[in-house]
Curated annotation (Swiss-Prot):
Keyword presence, tRNA-binding: no
Species name: Candida albicans (strain SC5314 / ATCC MYA-2876) (Yeast)
SUPFAM superfamilies, per the entry: Zn2/Cys6 DNA-binding domain
Molecular-function annotations in GO: DNA binding; DNA-binding transcription factor activity, RNA polymerase II-specific; zinc ion binding
Name of the protein in its database record: Probable sucrose utilization protein SUC1
Compartment(s) of residence: Nucleus
DNA-binding region: 13-39
Record bears the keyword Membrane: no
Lineage: Eukaryota, Fungi, Dikarya, Ascomycota, Saccharomycotina
Length: 501
């Protein structure tokens, strides 16, 4: 048979066809004879070529042919722009200095053009804003209607992202959507989901190349400026999260900082730039040490010079007097939190040195006094507006202060500890999630201080009522007479520190 000629069609017997073996077409065929089978040809020949189209197949083909670009009106949003606008305006007015990465006017324009990616980003931002202001004891300042607060912005964001298959083509918008979903989830206390969203944002940023300086060379000035802000915002957020949740740091401080000359709101960005410095001064290796602080790995003695350098550079962080209170609170708390962590790692590695101010045992006592002096004019609302992260940082500063007091036996630090505890307790009255172990440790330290003061008063001639026969400490502490010195008949107030300064 010639090479290009097609073999004739054959029809094997029923048995060979069923067994899917070659039939020699004899009657009966040799395989049926060999296997003692009846050789028949009774099966009905099936129709060749295309069959009748099924309704389900027709519908699938129609859906495929009608599929449009995600930016068209094939996606039907559940929320109109008027439902998104209150949260977007709150971001523009109050939170741009914290997350200076979005132009609300540009976002609104894209949403009106049915851009699904912009709509998903607006939903994520709205969820983040609502969960952020939920911690504020009096959030009437933000004027968000009650019906808007009840909307499921996270669910709608996920629906929009699923429609556009966002993972296939990472963009700055998809990065920011993942970031604001992280903010929304962390404020709800959903730590695993929050970590996953932040890691997703970081991965997409690396795919785009935000961690490489070469990426910015071919970009227009405005776009490159925004990209740098996004990268540093991710870096700051990741470094806090990694200490909070003991997860390894990924992002390096690997690109040039952004310029204030390229920014429309330079006052707000100046504060953000100082915040970036707070988290950039310690290297990634130092952050790894922060995370491993509970491990037995020790740092070499020469590291003390590096830790001292970090403390001095953190000391140089300054804040513009015209910066918003929310931004001031964020920067000041972050700065002293980082200084407290640096002292803590110094102590953990036995590198304390009383001849170096920043490395001495009493340094946290000095830090706490400076910290309280810097925040005295900042309203409580500014701390609340920064979300639960501010409480975590305050507790870290306070526990480091307790370590310093215990090591130095310097009770002068108790006044600062009480004032910090007062601030934390006020924040605790909101819906913020308080790390219980650290909170209880501060409470126990202050209780011990009160007992020491009471017994000291007794030894100096003050009146101490008898403890009940069962030795109840509660009975002792609740007896009002322990607060007075002098005679039982005419008690006079003893030393009670004024912690409400």
């Amino acid at each position: 048979m010639s090479k290009g000629k097609r073999a004739p069609y054959t029809r094997p017997c029923d048995s060979c066809s069923f067994r899917k073996v070659k039939c020699d077409m004899k009657t009966p065929c040799s395989r049926c004879v060999l296997n003692n089978l009846k050789c028949t040809n009774n099966r009905i020949r099936k129709k060749c070529g295309p069959k009748k189209i099924r309704d389900r197949t027709r519908e699938a083909i129609n859906n495929l042919s009608n599929k449009e670009d995600p930016k068209t009106n094939s996606f039907i949003p559940h929320f109109q722009l008027d439902k998104l606008q209150p949260c977007l305006e709150t971001y523009q007015t109050w939170y741009y200095g914290i997350w200076p990465v979005l132009s609300i006017s540009d976002l609104n324009m894209k949403i009106t053009k049915r851009d699904v990616s912009a709509y998903a980003l607006a939903c994520a931002l709205s969820a983040a804003i609502l969960n952020q202001i939920d911690f504020i004891s009096n959030n009437g300042t933000y004027c968000i209607p009650e019906d808007v607060k009840k909307l499921d912005f996270i669910g709608e964001c996920i629906r929009a992202r699923t429609f556009m298959n966002y993972q296939m083509t990472p963009t700055l918008e998809t990065i920011l959507t993942s970031f604001f979903l992280h903010v929304a989830e962390v404020n709800k206390g959903s730590k695993p989901a929050a970590i996953i969203y932040l890691r997703e944002a970081i991965t997409m940023a690396q795919i785009i190349g935000l961690h490489n300086e070469s990426t910015y060379k071919s970009k227009p000035v405005a776009e490159a400026h925004r990209m740098r802000k996004i990268y540093f915002m991710l870096m700051v957020t990741e470094r806090f999260m990694c200490i909070d949740d003991l997860i390894p740091v990924v992002l390096e401080n690997s690109i040039k900082e952004f310029s204030l000359d390229d920014e429309q709101y330079s006052v707000l960005i100046d504060g953000f730039k100082e915040l970036v410095k707070v988290f950039s001064i310690p290297s990634k290796a130092i952050f790894d040490r922060f995370i491993q602080m509970n491990d037995s790995i020790s740092m070499p003695p020469e590291t003390a010079g590096l830790l001292n350098k970090i403390q001095l550079e953190l000391e140089s962080i300054c804040i513009s007097p015209v910066a918003p209170d929310i931004q001031k609170a964020n920067i000041i708390v972050s700065k002293y939190w980082m200084k407290a962590l640096t002292w803590k790692i110094t102590r953990k590695n036995n590198l304390l040195d009383d001849f170096v101010t920043t490395l001495c045992v009493k340094y946290p006592i000095e830090l706490s006094e400076q910290f309280l002096g810097e925040i005295k004019s900042i309203p409580l609302r500014a701390f609340e507006s920064n979300g639960p992260g501010v409480v975590f940082k305050l507790l870290s500063i306070a526990t480091v202060l307790i370590d310093s007091i215990n090591l130095s036996n310097d009770v002068s630090g108790y006044e600062s500890l009480q004032r910090m505890f007062d601030l934390i307790s006020k924040l605790k009255k909101t819906d913020m999630i308080i790390p219980r172990r650290e909170y209880d440790r501060i409470k126990e330290a202050l209780t011990k201080m009160e007992i020491d003061i009471f017994f000291s008063s007794a030894q100096s001639g003050g009146y101490i009522s008898e403890v009940e026969s069962n030795g109840s400490l509660d009975a002792f502490l609740t007896d009002p007479l322990v607060f007075y010195s002098g005679s039982n008949d005419n008690p006079t107030p003893s030393y009670i520190p004024d912690y409400q300064k």
